[in-house]
Amino acid sequence: MTAFNVVRFRVKPGREQDFLDAHRKMNRDFAGVKAIKVIKSGDRSYCIIGEWSDMADIVTARPAMIGNLDAIREMLEDLGGGLGLTDPVSGPVVLDLK
């Protein structure tokens, strides 16, 4: 069943273009990935949204995705509230309302 992962970030002032450029160059060749989108959700706030064939593919790709995060970590600002630099969630689609 299709699954999604979403990761929320806040980029340090002056680093937004670096953040976007880094994502253009990142490894996205993950088994089972259908689409990866970057959305701007606010001032210096972004979300990465990935669509996957199933949850197992997300789990398998996590080490490589963490490697991608390591490449941009210094561009990110702490989200506060004990979250750290990212706010990730993932799960299977339970209702498809096309």
Language-model segments: what does each one mean?
Residues Y46-G50, L95-K98:
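Short, solvent-exposed polar/charged micro-motifs at secondary-structure junctions
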Residues K25-V38, E51-D87:
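An amphipathic, aromatic/His-enriched active-site/gating alpha helix that lines ligand/cofactor pockets
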Residues K12-P13, A56, K98:
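A short, structured loop/turn motif at beta-sheet edges
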Residues L85-K98:
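Short, low-order "capping/linker" segments at domain edges
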Residues A3-F9, C47:
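Active-site-flanking beta-strand signature of metal-NTP-handling nucleotidyl enzymes
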Residues R8-D21:
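Short, surface-exposed ligand-recognition loops at beta-strand->loop->(often short) alpha-helix junctions
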Residues M1-T2, K98:
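Absolute protein N-terminus
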